Amino acid sequence: MAKYVIGSAWPYVQTVPHLGNMIGSVLSADVYARYLRLKGHEVVFVSGSDVHGTPVEVEAIQLGVDPAEYSMKMHAIVAELFKKWNISFDLYTHTHSETHIKFVQDFYLKIYENGYIFTKEDEVPYCPRDKIYLPDRFIIGKCPYCGYERARGDQCENCGRLLDPKQLIEPKCAVCGSKPEWRITKHWYLDLRRLEDRIRKYVEENPHLPPNAKEMSLAMLKEGLRPRAVTRDNKWGIPAPFPGAEGKTIYVWFEAVLGYISAVVEYFKKIGREEEWKRFWLDPETKVVFFVGKDNVPFHVIILPALLLANGGGYVMPTTTASTEYLLYEGDKFSKSRRWGVWIDEALQLLPADYWRFVLIYIRPENRDTNFSWSTALEIINKVLNDDVGNYANRVLSFIKNRMGGAVPPRGKPSRDDEEFIEKVKRLFEKAEAHYEAIELKDAVHTVVEIAREGNKYLNARAPWDLVKKDVDAANAVMYHAYWSLKFLAVGLAPAIPESAEQLWKMMGLDAPLTWEEAKRPPAVGKALGEVRPLFRKITEEEVKALLAKLEELRNQKYSRKYPWEQVVI
C-alpha cells in the first residue's frame, strides 16, 4: 500500500468558509482521503487555519481587537464546523502553533544559507494617516490585467494573477481608504529566477496536474518568474529569521504553504511518533496531493515547489494539485457583503451534512465553473439521493425483512439475468474506482449512483414479489444479488456521504469494516439485517421557501452582532 499526504488549502479565519470554499478544497480533499483509506492506503490528511498576515490584521484593526485573540477564536469555530461536516482530518491546526513557527523559521534559514535569499531596498506603500506600511491586503486597487476594482496588493482574486502593490491602479489603504505614499524599506527576496528551469521541468513533465493548474502555471512561466519578497512590514506573523531582519515577518502565503509539512510534523509529535513525519515527506515514493481552488494554483504549483527545491532538504515534490474551477451561487459569485451564498455554519442549520456533501460533490466544478441553485439541489436530493439511492436500498432491505425472514437469503442457482446484473454492478464499481483514482470525484459519485439505478431496473424486471409466490429459490437468488449490490453502493458512496453509508451498512447487519475489498466479498447467507428505515427524505418546494426564510432570519440575527465569532451559528 502507498503512503499519501493529503492537504486542503488553509482557510483564512476572518470568516467561516462558504459552500464554494468547501467544494474547492476541504470537502474534495476529505472525499479523496476517505477513498484512499477504504483502499487500505496509509493516509495523513492535514490542514489548518491561516491565522497570520494582512487579512486578519486588517480586520482586527478595524474592530479594535488583538489579532491573536481574533484568530484563535475564529480558528476554534472553524475547526468545530469542519467536525460537524464530518471532515476526517488527522490534524486540523493553525499557523500560529509553536511547531509551525519553528519549522518555518528553520526552513527559511536553510534557504538563506543556500544562497536563494537576497536583500533589496524597494519603494513600498505607506499610509500616513494610520502610520502603517500597506503590504498585501492592506492595499487595494484596480487590477492591471482584468480591471477588477478591489484587487489586493499581492493577488487579484478575480483573475488569480500574482501582483505587486505598484501594479495596482488607483491604490488606497484598505483600513481608511487614504491614498498611500511610497517609502523606501529593505526586504528579503526569494530568487525565483534561479529556480525557474527546474520549476518548468516539474510542471511540464507532471502528468497528474489538471488542465487548469498546468495552463495557469505554464502561462506564468512563459512570462518569466520574478524574485518575490518573502518578508513584510506587518506585525502579525512569523518573525523573519534572517540576520538584520528584526521587525519583519514572513509573508503569509510563503509560510502558510509550508503548513502541509509542519502539520505532518505536529501530527506525529502529538501521537508520540515524532520522527515518523520523515517517513512521509522525505520519501520520494510518498504521494502528496493538494486540493485548492484555481485562485490558489500559483502558490501550490510554483511557489511551494520552488521553496522545496531552494531548501534542498530532500522533500518529496507534490504529486499533483487538484484544482477546481469556481462554484457560483444562483448564477453569481459568493459575496458576504451582499449576503449572496450559503456559509457552512448556515448550511447545517438547514439540511443534514450528508445532503450538502452529496449535492456539492455531484456538481463539483472539475472542468468549468458550475452553479449551485436551490432548484438543482432539490432535484439532486429528491431524484438522485432519495429516489435512486435511498429508495433502492429501502426496497431491497424491506423486502428481505418482511418477506424473507429478515436475513440474507441463499444464493441458490442464479439465472443469467442475476449473473449479468452483478457483473454489471462490478464493472460500475471498477469504473467508479478509476474515477476516484484520477480525482474525478464528481464522475465517481455519478457512476456509483448508476449501481442503484441498475438495481431498481433489475428489481422491476425480475419482480421478486411475484417470484416468491411461485419459485422461492429464484426469488432468493434475486434478493441475494440485490443485497450484494448494496455493499458496492454503500462502499462506493462512503467517501462522499460517510454517515449515510455507515447507516446503510448497519441496516444490512454487516459487522465487517466498511472497506473497498469488503464490497467485493459475496454476502454471508443467513446474516440477520439490522433495523431498516429510510435513509433519506424528499424536500418539497415549500420547505425550500421555509429554509430560505430561516436563512434570512439567521442572517438578521448574525449580522446584528459586532464580532465575527459572534456571527457564526453552531
Curated annotation (Swiss-Prot):
Intracellular or extracellular location(s): Cytoplasm
Catalysis performed (reactions): tRNA(Met) + L-methionine + ATP = L-methionyl-tRNA(Met) + AMP + diphosphate
Intervals of motif 'KMSKS' region: 333-337
GO cellular component annotations of the record: aminoacyl-tRNA synthetase multienzyme complex; cytosol
Keywords: Aminoacyl-tRNA synthetase, ATP-binding, Cytoplasm, Ligase, Metal-binding, Nucleotide-binding, Protein biosynthesis, Zinc
GO BP of this protein: methionyl-tRNA aminoacylation
Primary residence: cytoplasm
Motif ('HIGH' region): 11-21
Gene3D superfamilies: HUPs (3.40.50.620), Isoleucyl-tRNA Synthetase, Domain 1 (1.10.730.10), Methionyl-tRNA synthetase, Zn-domain (2.20.28.20)
Note on how the cofactor is bound: Binds 1 zinc ion per subunit.
Pfam family membership, one: tRNA-synt_1g
Annotated GO MF terms: ATP binding; metal ion binding; methionine-tRNA ligase activity
Needed co-factor(s): Zn(2+)
EC number in record: 6.1.1.10
UniProt key word Amino-acid biosynthesis: no
Role, per record: Is required not only for elongation of protein synthesis but also for the initiation of all mRNA translation through initiator tRNA(fMet) aminoacylation.
Family: Belongs to the class-I aminoacyl-tRNA synthetase family. MetG type 1 subfamily.
Stated name of the protein: Methionine--tRNA ligase
Species the sequence originates in: Pyrobaculum aerophilum (strain ATCC 51768 / DSM 7523 / JCM 9630 / CIP 104966 / NBRC 100827 / IM2)
Gene behind the chain: metG
